[in-house]
Amino acid sequence: MPNMSSNIPRMQQRYDESVRAALTETYGYKNVHQVPRLLKISMNMGVGAAVGDKKVLDLAIDSMTQITGQKPVTTIARKSIAGFRLREGMPIGCMVTMRRQRMYEFLDRLVSIVLPRVRDFRGISRKAFDGNGNYTLGLNEQLVFPELNPDKFVRPQGMNISFVTSAKTDDEAREMLRLFGMPFKQPKEKEQAGAA
């Protein structure tokens, strides 16, 4: 019988073996179902230039497909805005939702390969939580992903990556993502002194 553990993504193994235990010890959960877990990762690209040029949106869809391994859904404008020459129903972006194995594989690539390639990287913001344990990370350009060919993309395109967790508070979610290896900025000395 083949070894099934080799098919489990590295980040999922890390969660099962160390993250869950560390969170239980830190927060004193009584039940394993109380321990926060990562539910999904959503990637969103708003392509405002798609109003004038449809090829820009096709490039964004192609890049997102290469990055995630899934075909993205096209997002459309909900209302018309004359100043932007935007009409209701026009395609203006794309998004992908990753769950289970693809989610853990993407998180592994993001933490170990992509974030270290970001220019002048000093850690990700500790404040981008929504109050319900979810975190959103913004990237200025998609070319930090090694899957993409830089010659194919004329203009850099930014994206938002949202981590949806089952955590009740931002502190629990921050600790879980930190244990996964997310490189958060260290709190400034004023914040540390104010907390003490």
From Swiss-Prot:
Secretion signal span: none
Family: Belongs to the universal ribosomal protein uL5 family.
Cell wall biogenesis/degradation is among the record's keywords: no
Residues spanning the membrane: none
Assembly: Part of the 50S ribosomal subunit; part of the 5S rRNA/L5/L18/L25 subcomplex. Contacts the 5S rRNA and the P site tRNA. Forms a bridge to the 30S subunit in the 70S ribosome.
Tagged with keyword Nucleotidyltransferase: no
Organism encoding this protein: Rhodopirellula baltica (strain DSM 10527 / NCIMB 13988 / SH1)
GO annotation, biological process: translation
Any one Gene Ontology molecular-function term assigned to this protein's record: rRNA binding
Pfam families according to UniProt: Ribosomal_L5 (PF00281), Ribosomal_L5_C (PF00673)
Task performed by this protein: This is one of the proteins that bind and probably mediate the attachment of the 5S RNA into the large ribosomal subunit, where it forms part of the central protuberance. In the 70S ribosome it contacts protein S13 of the 30S subunit (bridge B1b), connecting the 2 subunits; this bridge is implicated in subunit movement. Contacts the P site tRNA; the 5S rRNA and some of its associated proteins might help stabilize positioning of ribosome-bound tRNAs.
PROSITE patterns, per the entry: RIBOSOMAL_L5 (PS00358)
Superkingdom of origin: Bacteria
NCBIfam families: PRK00010.1
Disulfide bond sites: none
Name this protein carries in UniProt: Large ribosomal subunit protein uL5
Keywords for the protein's UniProt record, in alphabetical order: Ribonucleoprotein, Ribosomal protein, RNA-binding, rRNA-binding, tRNA-binding
GO CC annotations on file: cytosolic large ribosomal subunit
